[in-house]
């Protein structure tokens, strides 16, 4: 039938595997402002709570990638330039500046990668540590985060 609305599909994905999902600010089932899909591998068991917790974390903190290996080099290079500009006028020796640069870059990577981020439900641990707490072997293959307006 015809509904008279101009509906255009902007994005689509194809994701297979053990998929978990979460919709934030849900106005009805499956409809909200932020949606997350998560694909994990595990050697055994039901990981519904784990999947939901990781999806909620992704919705809240918006990581750019799973790990620093997955970040585009251009993204890292832009941040390095920003850090260099911040440190340039500090007047400190070059060896100190290098260490400060490494520390700031490490913090940036932790804040922008899923495995490096502090777990939103328990900030005393990282997502990597949260995964390691599980008895079964779990690995995160992929995540997709959609937000209305982005």
Task: State the predicted function of each range.
Residues 1-150:
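N-terminal assembly/interaction segments in proteins that build large macromolecular machines
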């Amino acid at each position: 039938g015809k509904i008279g609305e101009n509906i255009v599909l902007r994005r689509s994905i194809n994701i297979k595997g053990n998929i978990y999902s979460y919709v934030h600010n849900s106005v009805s089932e499956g409809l909200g402002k932020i949606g997350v899909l998560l694909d994990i591998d595990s050697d055994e068991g039901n990981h519904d709570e784990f999947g939901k917790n990781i999806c909620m974390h992704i919705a809240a903190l918006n990581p750019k990638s799973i790990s620093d290996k997955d970040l585009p080099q251009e993204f890292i290079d832009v941040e390095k330039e920003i850090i260099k500009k911040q440190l340039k006028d500090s007047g400190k020796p070059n060896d100190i500046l290098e260490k400060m640069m490494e520390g700031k870059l490490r913090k940036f990577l932790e804040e922008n990668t899923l495995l490096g981020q502090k777990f939103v439900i328990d900030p005393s641990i990282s997502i990597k540590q949260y995964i390691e707490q599980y008895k079964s072997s779990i690995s995160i293959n992929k995540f997709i985060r959609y937000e209305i307006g982005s």
